[in-house]
Amino acid sequence: MDSSLFSLKNSFGGFNDEELLRVQKIIEDLELTESIVSKEWVTFALQKKIAEDYSKHLDPFKVFLKKNIKKLKVQKTTEQIKEVAEEDPKMFENVEIEDIIFDTDSLVDESEIPKIKDEPSSSVDVSTARNKNNHNNNNNNNPSLPNKSMFKPTKQEMTNDNIKKVVIADDIGDFDFTTANQPIKQSNPTQLLNYKERKNIGGISYSMNNNEELKTDLSLREKKSCDLKGAGEEFYPIKYHRDTLEQRTKILKESVQSNNYTFPVSLDCQDDESIVRSVGRVWMYDQETILSKRFYLLGNERDSSSSGGSSGSASIFSLENNIPDYSMFSGQVVMAESKKIAGSHFYYTNKLYTPNPLPFFSQRKECGDINVMIASGPFDLQKSTPDYTPLDDLCNVVSNKKPHILFLMGPFIDESNVHIKKYSETFSELFNNLMKKLNDNIPSTTKVLIVPSLNDVDHEYIFPQPPYVPSVNLNSNILFVPNPFTLIINESFTIGITSSDIYNNLVSKAHFKNKHTPEDIFNMIINQNNYYPMHPAQAPISMRYLQHLNFPGFTPDILVVPKNSPIAAISNDVLCLGVPPIVGNKSTFGSYAELTVTKSKQSLAFDNNIPVSKRTIVNFKNI
């Protein structure tokens, strides 16, 4: 066999010699490279669902290439320049490769090259345009990198032709020419609210299960004491170490196999030998391709050397357009039911299965009604001196209502507070003073659980987070727990809580075929049996402690996460709560959650079969 055909046989698996000769002729006629044509064949084969009889599809494939010839020529030029640059890096030391490509007029029409319109400098406010990618693509998993831009321009207002513009008097840095001529939208400044002037104090902003039957039963029942027990293994004190990319990939792959996920169907499909079922973590094919169109399954045991995209032998999956519904995010463990394209590592997938949720806590005992309050930080008004008036008011509410349990989620000293550098107290002193305030103003009958946050400036920036360790003596009812945390109350029901921003992260990064609801977002978390199933994570996850993000062998009856606005939803019989901050952005003021977990109907005595989600009264009340 000719050496060139032997090379083609590796790129076009399943092709016979005659078909390979035709492919070679296409490459020569269109003056493209083998790598480009092989990649385009994969795309073409997936679109047309070609699994055999390649010969009859080669002429349409050549037409397909001709339609995209300009783009492919640019790709070829880019490959050639990069090869030269690798051999002699100094040749293009001060030149951008994209600039060289744009100079090749024979390959690209002038009409396709982005241009900057010649306009007077007064008509365009170029100083506000910056290259967003360079500021938004920080590695959030590295705590040593700043998560906020250090660019602090000064602003000066100018008027030109009665149009108010904003000019930033600073170096424009990496200027984004593609946005230079876009008009600037001048939004009205948000008026800061005065805390004392807030309205509807104590009013209900959101409720669930607030029906008369539960209220009547609640008034007849006697409150009992509350016994608390944490679930899961301790993982602190934390040991810091650096995770290499290879280590992170290996741990993520192994976690798929070690967790023993159960699915609605068997991994082996005996009814149809052409169908292949594969289990793994959804992983992006590249930054440009939509997740549903092409992805890897990290940890897929059917791959002999799966490496999450770094190896050409890793299987590539693509969802068919006729799938009625799906929801996907990177890091999600799924089972893909697919058909393989013969002679390749590509599969087109017509069904996706997610793991079955874990069962609920089983060893339940009879318990009286339990009252729980939940509040999320920040709790300060972000002034030049510490002002925790909202926390004082919350303590007064707790003192009057005397709930069994109070959850306080951080941040307690918020890193976004621009005034904290001006405070005379150290962060440790400020936190200890806050704990003393809770200790002195909250009844000893109320168990207070302090949950740290990644936005706490005085706590460890690693996830999962260990609990706070204050250097002050406190009553035994003030308890410090890790983030995330699962609590067993009176061996009757369970609450799982995390202050990580997993809800908003999933909303922004997940892919849905149809419109999604809050129940869909919560369902993603529950089906993954994990408090933070997204990878790559927007939280600084330590791979050494990855397993401590898993649910502790059961699904919590109540799942609590932070959210910008209050929400209560039932997903898979789990009561899911999104708790807003007490003090939000622009000094807006939020609400806290009040829960009453009741027994079943009095006539039925205690019935374990009625989910906690259906016998819990939920009220969000304004601070």
Curated annotation (Swiss-Prot):
**Sorted alphabetically, which keywords does the UniProt record give?**
DNA replication, Nucleus, Phosphoprotein
Q: Which Pfam families match?
A: DNA_pol_E_B
Query: Region annotation Disordered: residue ranges?
Result: 113-151
Q: Which InterPro entries match?
A: DNA_pol_a/d/e_bsu, DNA_pol_alpha_bsu
Report the locations given in the UniProt record. Nucleus
Q: Which GO terms describe its molecular function?
A: DNA binding
Assembly and interaction partners? DNA polymerase alpha:primase is a four subunit enzyme complex, which is assembled throughout the cell cycle, and consists of the two DNA polymerase subunits A and B, and the DNA primase large and small subunits. Subunit B binds to subunit A.
Family to which this protein belongs: Belongs to the DNA polymerase alpha subunit B family.
Know the name of this protein? DNA polymerase alpha subunit B
Q: Which species does the entry assign this protein to?
A: Dictyostelium discoideum (Social amoeba)
